[in-house]
């Protein structure tokens, strides 16, 4: 499989497809970070997502890869803001310009493989991104050869579809994991089918998908937090994502050399170690009372995106700082719930969503 017009190395044995070996760099121990990145490259990892939790990452990446820049692919996000030293989200044009200049300097590069329209989840986000000039800036960077390909990231299939309609996008970053997709029989409803339709469109149009949150923020690796009531392994989660149409690379978070070694082990894993068919033996009762983000409760009379609010909350409580920031940028938050009961009556998994909105509003403070 080829991302845009560039070749990409690294086959996943047994998947029937070629895929970039990719990672998403997470915060971790300061010592050895650059060395760990060099080690990753030496072992065939050549695709890096740079929507990271902290600003220091860019310096480490620049030191690790400046001498082998042509051998690695960078996803750089036009809308990720690190002016405070930590991740922030913005559609402000001047902030985006400052951030891209700063990131290019720290990365010690004069070009970006994939310039991403960053994390737009609501229609108003996309409208602002165009109105504020951020999209035109990204297009100008591509016209001038600084950006090689345009990508986009979103958690919302409907909006992703709309952005793909522009014909501008070569790559899409999307969350793919069993927790988000789990549906059975009469429960095969809502966003799961929308997501599959989106993946198939990407496959048909030659748009590569890079996968974020393959472990659902760690939820799937722990029996206590997994919606299935039992843990999956990282290799099962990676294979699950790779088997979806259009997927080019899966981007698990890494912190150190040990994480890289664990990830590289996937390439030598047996079919049995990758097999995730256990999911099919689980029945809908296994997830009753847990939101699986199917959005069967939509449309909400008060305008809330109930599934997305739940998703951000579930990720935030297990330590995903980016999810908390995304929540605070939602137009309608849990505190806007009017407890009308519409979602409670429509939820096929019997989640008490009105009560849950109160819990989420209390957690985030809004």
Residue ranges and their predicted role:
Residues 1-78, 82, 143:
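N-terminal binding-site loop/beta-alpha segment at the start of enzyme catalytic domains
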Residues 3-6, 36-41, 45-46, 63, ...:
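Structured C-terminal cap/extension of enzyme domains
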Residues 11-17, 24, 48-50, 72-76, ...:
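Hydrophobic faces of well-ordered beta-strands that scaffold small-molecule active sites
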Residues 17-31, 78-97, 123-127, 222-231:
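Active-site mouth loops of central-metabolism enzymes
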Residues 19, 52-56, 78-82, 116-121, ...:
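Active-site-proximal loop/turn and secondary-structure-junction residues that shape catalytic pockets
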Residues 28-31, 42, 88-210:
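Glycine/proline-rich, positively charged
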Residues 66-68, 91-93, 167-170, 190-191, ...:
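Short, hinge-like loop/turn segments at secondary-structure boundaries
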Residues 71-75, 168-177, 270-277:
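Short hydrophobic/aromatic-enriched beta-strand-loop microsegments
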């Amino acid at each position: 499989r080829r991302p845009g017009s560039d070749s990409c190395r690294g086959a996943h044995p047994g998947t029937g497809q070629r895929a970039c070996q990719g990672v998403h760099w997470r915060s971790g121990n300061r010592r050895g970070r650059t060395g760990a990145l060099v080690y990753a490259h030496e072992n065939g990892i050549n695709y890096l997502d740079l929507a990271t939790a902290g600003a220091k990452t860019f310096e480490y990446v620049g030191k690790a890869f400046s001498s082998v820049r042509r051998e690695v692919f960078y996803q750089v996000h036009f809308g990720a803001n690190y002016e405070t030293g930590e991740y922030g989200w913005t559609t402000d044009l001047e902030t985006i310009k400052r951030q891209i200049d700063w990131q290019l300097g720290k990365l010690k590069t004069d070009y970006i493989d994939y310039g991403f329209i960053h994390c737009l989840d609501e229609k108003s986000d996309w409208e602002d991104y165009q109105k504020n000039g951020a999209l035109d800036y990204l297009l100008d960077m591509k016209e001038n050869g600084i950006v090689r390909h345009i990508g986009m990231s979103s958690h919302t299939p409907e909006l992703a579809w709309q952005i793909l309609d522009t014909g501008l996008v070569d790559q899409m970053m999307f969350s793919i994991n069993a927790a988000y997709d789990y549906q059975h029989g009469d429960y095969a409803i809502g966003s799961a089918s929308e997501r599959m339709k989106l993946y198939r469109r990407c496959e048909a149009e030659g748009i590569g998908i890079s996968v974020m949150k393959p472990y659902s923020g760690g939820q799937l690796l722990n029996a206590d937090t997994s919606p299935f009531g039992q843990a999956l392994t990282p290799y099962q989660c990676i294979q699950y994502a790779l088997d979806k149409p259009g997927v080019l690379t899966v981007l698990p978070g890494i912190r150190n050399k040990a994480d890289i070694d664990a990830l590289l082990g996937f390439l030598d894993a047996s079919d049995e170690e990758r097999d995730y068919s256990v999911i099919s033996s689980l029945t809908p009762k296994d997830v009753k009372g847990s939101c699986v983000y199917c959005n069967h409760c939509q449309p909400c009379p008060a305008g809330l995106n109930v599934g997305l609010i739940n998703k951000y909350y579930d990720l935030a409580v297990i330590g995903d700082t980016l999810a908390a920031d995304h929540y605070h940028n939602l137009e309608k938050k849990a505190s806007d719930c009017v407890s009308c009961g519409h979602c409670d009556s429509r939820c096929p998994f019997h989640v008490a969503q009105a009560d849950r909105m109160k819990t989420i509003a209390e957690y985030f403070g809004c």
